[in-house]
Design a protein with these regions (language model features):
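Non-catalytic macromolecular-recognition regions in eukaryotic signaling proteins
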Residues: 2-121, 127-308
């Protein structure tokens, strides 16, 4: 009996040691030599303060955070706002850091004279002193002055679908739809334009309702209807497009199964319009976003792609 207990104890110790060794090996196999900053394709507006959300991957067992991002072309430095969202996986952390810059008056005047500020090459500094020189993708800071439409609703979902509804005082004609990140996104951004839709018209007037049950019924009916909307590549839309009463722009981010799926997108497509009096206007859509939902497997694919 004592011998059996001794054997069981020995086997238990061996099993624990083997499990520990296997765990250490797994950690080493999945370890990345440095943080992986995703490519970002973003468009933000020029203000005295500008925020950037940056996504990056780190080893799970190492506490490392972005302190700052420096863009040497324009001598701009964004600093950490002490906000970080972390999604913990088995071997990695998928992080989102928010960084901020405050521009002085001279900088604002200088940049307002430029059509666009395009940020690509970046130097990232971490809280452990590590520095990385990377191509961050393409971040566009613009100072466009828009004469826009009146938006009554804007929404987006985790599936990549988004919708914006505009209430129109007069009929308008949409002549063109453009984006400063068109070349980077036109293969997977699709749209549909709808005018004077009964549900959209009802939604515009929903604030006049006082019956909460009635409001919920209208909203449920409205959102269920979105499942049947088919979107098309922007260059296949029938333009010019005339709209009256309401204009809804439906957008679907249909990500391709290629390297783009590892990138982050927060882009703007701009509607260029003319009203019935011949006045020209432009209105950007602000809810077209995509960011990858990482699993350990997807991170390993990205690590292999980056050669780390």
């Amino acid at each position: 009996m004592k011998k059996n207990k001794k054997k069981i104890l020995i086997f238990g110790v061996i099993a624990c040691i083997f499990s520990l060794i296997l765990n250490i090996v797994n950690i080493q196999v999945h370890k990345i030599s440095e943080p992986i900053v995703l490519e970002h394709y973003l468009e933000v507006s020029l203000h005295d303060e500008i925020d950037l959300s940056i996504n990056y991957i780190t080893n799970k067992r190492y506490s490392i955070k972005i302190n700052s991002i420096y863009f040497p072309k324009y001598d701009l430095t964004f600093y950490d706002k002490n906000f970080q969202d972390t999604n913990s996986l088995k071997y990695y952390n998928s992080n989102t850091a928010v960084l901020n810059i405050r521009l002085n008056l001279d900088q604002q005047k200088e940049y307002e004279e430029m059509d666009n500020i395009i940020l690509e090459d970046a130097v990232i500094t971490y809280n452990n002193g590590l520095e990385q020189n990377i191509d961050i993708g393409k971040i566009i800071i613009n100072n466009n002055k828009e004469k826009g439409l009146r938006s009554t609703m804007s929404s987006s979902s985790s599936t990549g679908f988004s919708k914006t509804v505009f209430e129109l005082d007069n009929s308008i004609i949409i002549n063109d739809i453009t984006s400063k990140l068109y070349e980077e996104t036109h293969n997977f951004v699709k749209m549909n334009l709808v005018t004077n839709d009964e549900l959209d018209n009802t939604l515009v007037n929903i604030s006049k309702e006082t019956d909460k049950d009635k409001i919920m019924e209208i909203e449920d009916n409205y959102h269920n209807n979105q499942k049947d909307i088919e979107c098309y590549p922007v260059d296949e839309l029938q333009l010019p497009f005339q709209a009256y009463n309401t204009l809804s722009v439906n957008t679907n981010f249909e990500m391709l199964d290629n390297d783009c799926k590892y990138n982050v997108y927060d882009i703007r497509y701009t509607l260029h319009s003319t009203d019935e009096n011949g006045n020209e206007g432009s209105q950007s859509l602000y809810n077209i976003r995509y960011s990858p939902y990482f699993t350990d497997k997807l991170v390993r694919q990205l690590v292999k792609k980056r050669g780390l």
